[in-house]
Design a protein with these regions (language model features):
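Binuclear metal-ion centers of metallo-dependent hydrolases, dominated by the metallo-beta-lactamase
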Residues: 122-199
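Active-site-proximal loop/helix segments of hydrolase catalytic cores
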Residues: 99-104, 110-138
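Binuclear metal-dependent hydrolase catalytic cores
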Residues: 1-115, 181-199
Length: 199
């Protein structure tokens, strides 16, 4: 994450929303350190209680307020228990099934939504996604997987939600970018590191 923040010239973050605490989604937390120091304050971190419990245990030093500590606090944890407003943007969280009883949070930001690490979406999730214009959505690989949506399932979700633009994310190494791009129907595209989406 550090390199992506540097490449994008990011110098300020209003908040960080965590979908869940799995390593591939949470272990960049320490990379927020330089931003927190630059901004002169800890960064507000949002997640459900299970995610915050994992983060504050695994990265206790990042949340600990101790003026004598070597590492100064870089994050303040906030539990998501419903819609909220951050940096002037309305955020609507919704639960997603991640397989084997695990759940993640998807997020809707006005006309845009972000849904990764999901293998099933319930009716409440589809209701939260209704009318979305841009949807960044999970698509791990072509074959079914027990914890992530695969290409066919993702396309079925997109057909139901009907966003103007859908961007596939969380793709594994088996998906060749150009081949996947060719297989995508109009309005659907694979994402890539550094992609900027105007909303």
């Amino acid at each position: 994450m550090r390199e992506q923040l540097l490449d994008a010239g990011v110098k300020h973050i209003d908040a960080v929303l965590y979908t869940h605490a799995h390593a591939d989604h949470s272990h960049g937390l320490n990379d927020l350190r330089s931003l927190a120091y630059h901004m002169g304050r800890p960064i507000d971190i949002y997640g459900n209680q299970a995610t915050l419990d994992d983060l504050t245990t695994s990265f206790a030093y990042a949340f600990r307020q101790d003026e004598h500590a070597v590492y100064k606090r870089i994050a303040v944890a906030h539990q998501i228990d419903g819609p909220l407003r951050l940096g002037g943007i309305d955020v609507v969280p919704f639960e997603q099934e991640h397989g084997f009883g695990a759940t993640t949070l998807g997020f809707r930001f006005g006309a845009m939504a972000y849904s990764t690490d999901a293998v099933e979406l319930d009716e409440a999730a589809f209701a939260a996604l209704a009318g979305v214009d841009v949807w960044i959505v999970d698509c791990l690989r072509y074959e079914p997987h027990p914890t992530h949506a695969h290409f066919e399932r993702t396309l079925a979700w997109i057909a139901r939600v009907k966003p103007r633009r859908a961007v596939l994310t969380h793709m594994n190494q088996a998906l060749d970018y150009e081949e996947l791009r060719r297989r995508c129907p109009p309005g659907v595209e694979p994402g890539y590191d550094g992609l900027v989406i105007e909303v």
